[in-house]
Amino acid sequence: MELRFPRFSQGLAQDPTTRRIWFGIATAHDFESHDDITEERLYQNIFASHFGQLAIIFLWTSGNLFHVAWQGNFESWIQDPLHVRPIAHAIWDPHFGQPAVEAFTRGGAAGPVNIAYSGVYQWWYTIGLRTNEDLYTGALFLLFLSTLSLIAGWLHLQPKWKPSLSWFKNAESRLNHHLSGLFGVSSLAWTGHLVHVAIPASRGEYVRWNNFLDVLPYPQGLGPLLTGQWNLYAQNPDSSNHLFGTAQGAGTAILTLLGGFHPQTQSLWLTDMAHHHLAIAFIFLIAGHMYRTNFGIGHSIKDLLEAHTPPGGRLGRGHKGLYDTINNSIHFQLGLALASLGVITSLVAQHMYSLPPYAFIAQDFTTQAALYTHHQYIAGFIMTGAFAHGAIFFIRDYNPEQNEDNVLARMLDHKEAIISHLSWASLFLGFHTLGLYVHNDVMLAFGTPEKQILIEPIFAQWIQSAHGKTTYGFDILLSSTNGPAFNAGRSLWLPGWLNAVNENSNSLFLTIGPGDFLVHHAIALGLHTTTLILVKGALDARGSKLMPDKKDFGYSFPCDGPGRGGTCDISAWDAFYLAVFWMLNTIGWVTFYWHWKHITLWQGNVSQFNESSTYLMGWLRDYLWLNSSQLINGYNPFGMNSLSVWAWMFLFGHLVWATGFMFLISWRGYWQELIETLAWAHERTPLANLIRWRDKPVALSIVQARLVGLAHFSVGYIFTYAAFLIASTSGKFG
């Protein structure tokens, strides 16, 4: 018999319909469901695929470096980072007429180019790269790493090199190696790079392999380290009139705690960042020696979990049984990893604009907006994925006997209380926030703006004041000049920090008012509702009062036949599917808020945000409509301009988004009838009837159509907003 796709499932391979193709694609990565899979082979396959993932990442980043070196303007951008536009790569497009060629020839290039809004120029400049040759070297090195990863992946699939199951289940050793090796050693190496290459480069000293061993990063070398006078490394830092990349105003310190920003670059002090990475390295190198392996010293995680019984007996048997539950479930581990990574990605978004680490990136407004939005959306997808795999854990891996009366079992036992509390919080936030917005909207419409309900966010302002913001007049903690906290940090990082917090040209602790209060609660509504749907999906994944035997149907069942009413749309997959819409809309509100607040800040008219953000029409008219004018102008009677590509993408994004509804709102029977009619016509048309299907065409299943609809909705939604964001920001600020 011929081998048909999918090889991993003989049952599917013999399916006579097009279902074979779609179900084959859908389950290609669900190794657990493949024929002849064993637990050991499952772990080995996943392990080997990680090397493939690394190879792709290294190849991609290598491509970034290569194209900028080949077609970019890195060397001229360095001369004037604030006025030269960084080029990502050239555009070769046979459709371009003369107006298009002229519109896209920018940044000192000879032909049409794309402008880089990713921040790579600022990053490479900050870490000490200075020439195109440096970029080519980096690209080649990453290409080498990519090849190495592919070889490693292939190697670990060979019989002699396949790790055993016991190796994968050795949690303590893996933790030690990841904490010490991944985090500890890499942070130490990065500190080394910053101290030996980046900091000298910021002071006009060019360190490469040829002079690496000759140039001392600090005049006294290792002397202060060996004699215990570590404070010497912080003495004589760069002055406030230091010109980045030159010796003018430069100091000699390498590990400092200055606080605040470098006045010229508006970014964190490089010497502060080196100090930070050294501290991180120190912590993780110690943490990586915490767990007991074959040396018989350190903690055994299992012993820790078993020994800890919560006081008062209110949490049952505490953490007993958790070690094996987590260690034997790949989905539990993936869920934990995704939850952590999702939070970290969102934190990256929040911190990259408020505490910018890269030189001059704070003054590149479009890049700031693009990076914030990018990281928030990525975080949203990763976080929803955490709950998806949590639900799969409950269905495939959870063993009630093993977890009797421990914290995990008790979560399931009182899931009704958890879900109903989340539901109450969502309803409260939703009705009150919408009520305020609608009330204010009506007052504006009736011409009585003074009757709006405007609430000052006094608690948030108090927190900002505690961190040193003096605008609001709260005399508290760091904004109080006679408190112990103020006096303790006065000789160290505090002056730099306070200067940064109270200088209104950056994004650190922006002044907030009633508009912020309202949108904050709108976002809280979105977060709580998304969480409600995800948590309910995971906690009800094994069964509910309506369908106690749900776990027997797997993760993504459509219904249990026509005879059981109410079993449609209640699989854990359906909860994930619904939550993604809420996630996208919530991040929509987050990014609208961030972008509008910053546009008005950068343009110097913050009153526009303050006055218009308290009612719905303000958001629709003064943010969305007003800022889409650049897009609508991408093509006009006078020809085209450099925003045309975004105008086209804006339209195309709407098209993709709207296509999603074709899959989401019409059901399977309609498509099945349509397909049968088309097949009939096909078979009776000359020439067309010479081509026959090997598989009988059938409509997508309900679950598959939802997935396709969701994919189009998500992609269209993000494309549309990306075009809007980049065009409206770059159109204003060049």
Swiss-Prot record:
Protein name: Photosystem I P700 chlorophyll a apoprotein A2
Catalysis: reaction(s): reduced [plastocyanin] + hnu + oxidized [2Fe-2S]-[ferredoxin] = oxidized [plastocyanin] + reduced [2Fe-2S]-[ferredoxin]
Gene responsible for this protein: psaB
Transmembrane regions listed in the UniProt entry: 46-69, 135-158, 175-199, 273-291, 330-353, 369-395, 417-439, 517-535, 575-596, 643-665, 707-727
Enzyme class, UniProt record, top EC level: oxidoreductase
Classification via Pfam families: PsaA_PsaB
Note on cofactor: P700 is a chlorophyll a/chlorophyll a' dimer, A0 is one or more chlorophyll a, A1 is one or both phylloquinones and FX is a shared 4Fe-4S iron-sulfur center.
Residues bound to chlorophyll a B3: 662, 670
